[in-house]
Amino acid sequence: MKKIWVILFVIFFFVGFAVTQESQSQHTVYVECGALWDVKSEKLIPKVRIAVSLPDGKIAAVQPHQPGILLGVASGTIENIDLSKETCLPGLIDTHTHVLLQGDITDVDYDFQLLKESPEYRTIVATVNARRALEYGFTAIRDLETEGAGYADVDVKKAIENGVVPGPRMQVATRALNVTGAYPLEGYAPNVPVPHGVQVVDGPEEARKAVREQILYGADWIKVYADRNYRVREDGVLDDIPTFTMDELRAIVDEAHRERHKVASHAMALHGVHNSVEAGVDSIEHGAYIADEDLKTMVAHDTFYVPTIFVFEYVAQGRAAEGATVWPKMLKIHEDTFRRALKAGVKIAFGTDAGGFAWTENPAQEFSYMVKYGMTPAQAIRAATVSASELLGMQDKIGTIEPGKFADIVAVLGDPLADVRVLEKVDFVMKGGMVYKKP
């Protein structure tokens, strides 16, 4: 009998200890918002309380604020965050960045980064850029290639996920793909070996092998450069030289999709866009000119359009001064394309090409340009939340503020529906229940 009591005591002691430890680890954070912009209903809801459970970092409840009534509490400690003077939104998503790129190439030559900065140095700088992205309010990014730094983006992503450095959620495209002669460092003798900003492939089999290799080493996306050498024709169409053959492009898309990965295409003009859409890519990046027939195909195939407007405005004059006079002409063409895509019902996701301009510039300036080009503020915000999360395949995890999703929350003073520029002044950032910036 005594032996039975000893056994029962040991069982109850350890069960009680486990329960105590579990309750101690549970923590609920209440975010008291002056208003919440519901990106799904497109309504501004006043006085909302968001319950965030830790350590899982997910939203437990979203309810109108009622003093004295605490929702979503299982057990454990409670913390309150007062944002009663602010408007809360889902964490913003930038679907086109380059944390390993230095900025406008008219300020610093592209050669400089590839020839004079080591991948190690660039990776350190990339962690700073990733933190900047987060503090700007971007809790998730899709980083579209390292520009000659190999698989360094995979390690930046890993360091963020392991809590080594702060940064947004990342999907990465590693090295990107192009053909011989289409993405070179120019002006060097043929006998001088110089690095490439991309992985060079020629022929369908090389292309397939490169896709497999990049996925093996951590690529979430495959990126292709589909065109080059731009000119404006007399009829106003932005013309180009396509890089890949259709066989090559189809092989890349087929191999990526077979491996359940998506393909992003840098496609600026007529042929690059058309070939990419016909090959079945998942997103068109930049798309300064897209023919109406290709817009129809994009709608039919659910192909996303990531217009990256701000970077065009940012670099156009500098590139024109260097002799690329096509760039200022692109601006009007780009605006017309954006308006036609919007009218046609193409899915548009927010993306900035940050790194193509200096990271000291706030990527949220893209919102103002999207509105200037024809979107409402509500549509622009949706592009950076709901639509962007769908492009990333993370719509069940991020993009809206609702129970079960990660607590990725930002807040601003003022009403972004009245003035979208307030999104350039995010002063509260939470990612996965952890606060990275507060008023």
Where are these regions (language model features)?
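Active-site gating loops and adjacent loop-to-helix segments of metal-dependent hydrolytic enzymes
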Residues: 100-122, 180-195, 230-244, 300-331
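Metal-associated gating/positioning segment near the N- to mid-region
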Residues: 83-158, 162, 247, 279
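Histidine/acidic-residue-rich catalytic or RNA/ligand-binding cores of hydrolases
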Residues: 104-106, 153, 182, 232-234, ...
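His/Asp/Glu-enriched, well-ordered alpha-helical/loop segment
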Residues: 112-114, 258, 330-416
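Histidine/acidic residue-rich metal-binding segments in metalloenzymes
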Residues: 155, 205-226, 230-305, 329-348
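Divalent metal-dependent hydrolysis catalytic cores, especially in the metallo-beta-lactamase
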Residues: 125-151, 166-176, 219-229, 262, ...
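Bacterial N-terminal signal peptides
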Residues: 6-16
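Histidine-rich, glycine-flanked metal-binding segment
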Residues: 36, 41-89, 112
